[in-house]
C-alpha cells in the first residue's frame, strides 16, 4: 500500500460522509484511502481526507440492485450521503475498439460501467440528498470526450458523463445539490499504461515517454493525486458556488495548439 505523501492533504474536507463509487485503481485509492477490491484493505488516508470513518464493499455498477444496496448500506451506516463520487471506468479491458471493429456486447459492457452505472448511482442517492437539501456529486469523465480518441465506447460514454453532470446540476440546484465533472488528461495509472504496453510493439518505457511528451506542463503525465485534489476541492464548501462545470485536469494538453 502507498503512504500518503507529505503535504498531500492540507486539511479534511468540509463536506463529510462521501460515497466513492470505485476503488481499485490508483485514482480511486488517492481519493478515499487505499481500497483494493481484491483484498478490501483500507489505510488511514481516508480519515485524513474526510476526517471520519471509512467502509469498503463490493459493488457491481452494471447491476442496479447492487447499486441500490450500496446506497442503502451507506445510509444505514452513516445516516446521510453528502458527497457522491462516481469514478468507475473501463476502456480496452472491457473490449473497447474503433467504431468499425466494436462488438455490440463490448459497447454495451463499457457504456454500462462508464455511464449507466453513474446514472443509477445518482438515481438512488439523490432522494436522500434532496431530503437533506444538500449534496455534492463529483463525476469522472475524461479528456477523451473532447479530443480525438480511437476507441468508440469509452469516448461516447465519457461524453455522456459530461451531459449527465450538466443535467444533474440544473435539475437539482433548487435542492442545494451541486454536480461537477472532472476530465482527467494523460495520467500515469495502471489502467492507462498497462493496457497499452505491447500495442504496436511498444514497451512500457516507450508508452510512458510518448504520453509524457504530449503534456505541456512539465512534460510529464499527471498522477492520481492531481485528480484527488480536484475532486476533494469540488466536494468541499470552498467550491460552494460552482456547479455544472467540466474541469480539465490535464497539464494544459487541452489548450495545446499545433
What is the meaning of each model-derived region?
Residues 91, 95-96, 243-258:
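Short C-terminal tail/terminal secondary-structure segment
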Residues 95-99, 103-108, 211:
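Substrate-binding pocket helix/loop in short-chain dehydrogenase/reductase
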Residues 122, 157, 165:
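Active-site helix of classical SDR
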Residues 127, 170-171, 240:
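Alpha-helical segment proximal to the catalytic Tyr-Lys
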Residues 142:
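Residue(s) in the substrate-gating loop at a strand-loop-helix junction
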Residues 173, 178, 242-244:
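Short, small/polar-rich loop/turn modules that mediate ligand/substrate recognition or access, typified
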Residues 181, 204-238, 242, 249-251:
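C-terminal helical subdomain
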Amino acid at each position: 500500500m502507498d503512504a500518503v505523501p507529505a503535504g498531500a492533504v492540507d486539511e479534511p474536507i468540509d463536506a463529510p460522509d462521501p460515497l466513492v463509487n470505485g476503488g481499485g485503481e490508483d485514482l480511486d485509492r488517492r481519493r478515499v484511502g487505499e481500497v483494493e477490491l481484491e483484498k478490501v484493505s483500507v489505510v488511514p488516508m481516508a480519515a485524513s481526507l474526510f476526517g471520519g470513518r471509512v467502509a469498503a464493499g463490493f459493488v457491481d455498477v452494471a447491476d442496479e440492485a447492487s447499486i441500490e444496496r450500496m446506497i442503502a448500506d451507506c445510509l444505514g451506516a452513516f445516516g446521510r450521503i453528502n458527497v457522491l463520487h462516481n469514478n468507475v471506468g473501463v476502456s480496452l479491458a472491457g473490449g473497447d475498439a474503433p467504431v468499425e471493429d466494436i462488438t455490440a456486447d463490448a459497447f454495451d459492457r463499457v457504456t454500462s460501467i462508464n455511464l449507466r452505472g453513474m446514472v443509477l448511482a445518482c438515481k438512488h442517492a439523490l432522494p436522500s440528498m434532496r431530503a437533506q437539501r444538500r449534496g455534492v456529486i463529483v463525476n469522472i469523465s475524461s479528456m477523451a470526450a473532447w479530443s480525438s480518441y480511437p476507441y468508440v465506447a469509452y469516448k461516447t460514454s465519457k461524453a455522456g458523463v459530461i451531459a449527465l453532470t450538466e443535467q444533474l446540476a440544473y435539475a437539482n440546484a433548487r435542492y442545494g445539490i451541486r454536480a461537477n465533472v472532472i476530465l482527467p488528461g494523460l495520467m500515469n495509472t495502471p489502467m492507462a499504461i498497462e493496457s497499452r504496453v505491447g500495442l504496436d510493439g511498444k514497451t512500457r518505457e516507450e508508452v510512458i515517454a510518448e504520453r509524457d511528451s504530449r503534456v505541456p506542463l512539465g512534460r510529464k503525465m499527471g498522477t492520481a493525486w492531481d485528480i484527488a485534489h480536484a475532486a476533494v476541492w469540488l466536494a468541499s464548501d470552498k467550491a460552494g458556488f460552482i456547479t455544472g462545470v467540466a474541469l480539465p485536469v490535464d497539464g494544459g494538453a487541452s489548450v495545446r495548439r499545433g
